[in-house]
């Protein structure tokens, strides 16, 4: 049975239905240490293929019966096969999704909304990444439904290259973000110029 598929359902509230209290945000009920190649990034010393992006990320979770990160992680493990955005920026999108879902959710009707607004520094290998000046406006809904439970993710990522000083994108290895990056098979490698820097290869 195909558990991950696009549905006609949406996360919009039904205006005619009785308002319901959203379920509590999930606990970290599925914690584990990510693979060792996900090393924390420090200040990037290399100037090759490094770009600053002003980022706006949002993940809205719709689940009438509540949700856990076990289900979210299950959905994100198939992210590569359902991603509909610019393939040159899939690595950036994965990073932003992980960082966004590491924040605190805000209730919005029956939904929980995670938001991220930051200026971040990304470094790609020479053959990967966006073109000079390229921007991204990505929006997609991914749903999971097994006839007894429904979870929908509405993902929006806007990224514009900018000259504002930003921070490198990796966070504590033990964080939820690194777990989600591993689930989405984020592809990185260690920089040849800086042993403390990871480089995106997608």
From Swiss-Prot:
The keyword Transmembrane does not apply. One of its GO terms (molecular function) is structural constituent of virion. Keywords: Host membrane, Host-virus interaction, Membrane, Phosphoprotein, Viral budding, Viral budding via the host ESCRT complexes, Viral envelope protein, Viral matrix protein, Viral release from host cell, Virion. Its main location: virion. Residues 115-151 are annotated as: Essential for glycoprotein binding. It is a peripheral membrane protein. GO terms for biological process: viral budding via host ESCRT complex. Belongs to the lyssavirus matrix protein family. Most abundant protein in the virion. Plays a major role in assembly and budding of virion. Completely covers the ribonucleoprotein coil and keep it in condensed bullet-shaped form. Inhibits viral transcription and stimulates replication. Plays a major role in early induction of TRAIL-mediated apoptosis in infected neurons. This is Matrix protein.
């Amino acid at each position: 049975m195909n558990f991950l598929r696009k549905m006609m359902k949406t996360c919009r509230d039904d205006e005619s239905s009785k308002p319901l209290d959203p379920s509590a945000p999930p606990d970290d009920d599925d914690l584990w240490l990510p693979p060792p190649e996900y090393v924390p990034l420090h200040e990037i010393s290399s100037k090759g293929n490094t770009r600053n992006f002003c980022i706006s990320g949002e993940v809205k979770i719709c689940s009438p019966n509540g949700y856990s990160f076990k289900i979210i992680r299950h959905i994100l493990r198939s992210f590569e096969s359902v991603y509909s955005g610019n393939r040159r920026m899939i690595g950036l999108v994965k990073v932003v999704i992980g960082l966004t879902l590491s924040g605190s959710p805000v209730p919005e009707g029956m939904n929980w909304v995670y938001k991220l607004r930051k200026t971040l520094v990304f470094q790609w290998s020479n053959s990967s990444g966006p073109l000079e000046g390229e921007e991204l406006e990505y929006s997609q809904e991914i749903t999971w439904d097994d006839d007894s439970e429904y979870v929908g993710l509405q993902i929006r990522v806007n990224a514009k290259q900018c000259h504002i000083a930003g921070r490198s994108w990796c966070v504590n290895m033990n964080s939820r973000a690194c777990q989600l990056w591993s689930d989405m098979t984020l592809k990185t490698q260690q920089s040849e110029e800086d042993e403390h820097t990871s480089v995106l290869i997608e």
